[in-house]
């Protein structure tokens, strides 16, 4: 059975990617990060989420991206923006962008992949995020894959490493629809940037607004609880 490293955050996108990877028949090695994020709820959710899939091993890596701050997700001095309507959402890079986060996460995944002999890495970046987050763009993923094959022993031996982005051409609406078709139970996910201590989602941050809109367009109620 082919092995893969699957980056898993505990959000709806991650759950969908896990379901896709399982359907494709991979032996899944999941990797998550405790990086000093404001949303600790995602780590609690991800532990439950991976139990629903045939995950061979789940690693939670501790790193502290608060060391250089620069994001509302890692710096409590920067407020998370809240909105009243999905049409208010920004078109540019928001303060919730964590500098170089996907590069850091993919680098860890790459190292893990080499150790276990996996030539495939899955990450849940997609079209809906590409305008707001530069490290979610297809050209970024392509460049990282090229670097991965130049910078690793596997790559120079001709064992090509592939960064898979199964959601890349999907909107959030399509991602939720795909997950529902694959039987994903989204109640064990959380997308909120600023949930309460008892894991209630705020419903008004960028991530919540996009998620709620996607469920609405699929004519189904989001199963998680909101404030």
From Swiss-Prot:
It catalyses: 7-carboxy-7-deazaguanine + NH4(+) + ATP = 7-cyano-7-deazaguanine + ADP + phosphate + H2O + H(+). Keywords: ATP-binding, Ligase, Metal-binding, Nucleotide-binding, Queuosine biosynthesis, Zinc. ATP binds at residues 8-18. Zn(2+) binds at residues 192, 202, 205, 208. This is 7-cyano-7-deazaguanine synthase. HAMAP family: QueC. CDD domains: QueC-like. One of its GO terms (molecular function) is ligase activity, forming carbon-nitrogen bonds. It comes from Rickettsia canadensis (strain McKiel). Binds 1 zinc ion per subunit. Pathway: Purine metabolism; 7-cyano-7-deazaguanine biosynthesis. It holds the Pfam family QueC.
């Amino acid at each position: 059975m082919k092995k893969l490293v699957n980056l898993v955050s505990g959000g709806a996108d991650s759950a969908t990617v896990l379901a896709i990877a399982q359907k494709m028949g991979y032996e899944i090695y999941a990797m998550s990060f405790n990086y000093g994020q404001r949303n600790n709820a995602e780590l609690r959710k991800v532990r439950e989420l991976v139990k629903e899939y045939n995950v061979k091993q789940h690693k939670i890596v501790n790193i502290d991206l608060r060391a250089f701050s620069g994001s509302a997700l890692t710096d409590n001095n920067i407020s998370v923006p809240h909105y009243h309507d999905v049409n208010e959402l920004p078109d540019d890079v928001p303060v919730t962008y964590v500098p170089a986060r996907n590069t850091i996460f993919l680098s860890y995944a790459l190292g893990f992949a080499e150790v276990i002999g996996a030539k495939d890495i899955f990450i849940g970046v997609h079209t809906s995020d590409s305008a707001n987050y530069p490290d979610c763009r297809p050209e970024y993923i392509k460049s990282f894959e090229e670097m991965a094959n130049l910078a690793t022993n596997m790559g120079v031996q001709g064992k090509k490493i592939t960064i898979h982005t199964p959601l890349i051409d999907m909107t959030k609406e399509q991602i939720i629809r795909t997950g529902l078709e694959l039987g994903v139970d989204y109640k064990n996910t959380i997308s909120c940037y600023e949930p309460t201590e008892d894991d209630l989602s705020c419903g008004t941050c960028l991530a919540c607004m996009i998620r709620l809109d996607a469920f609405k367009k699929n004519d189904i109620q989001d199963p998680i609880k909101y404030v």
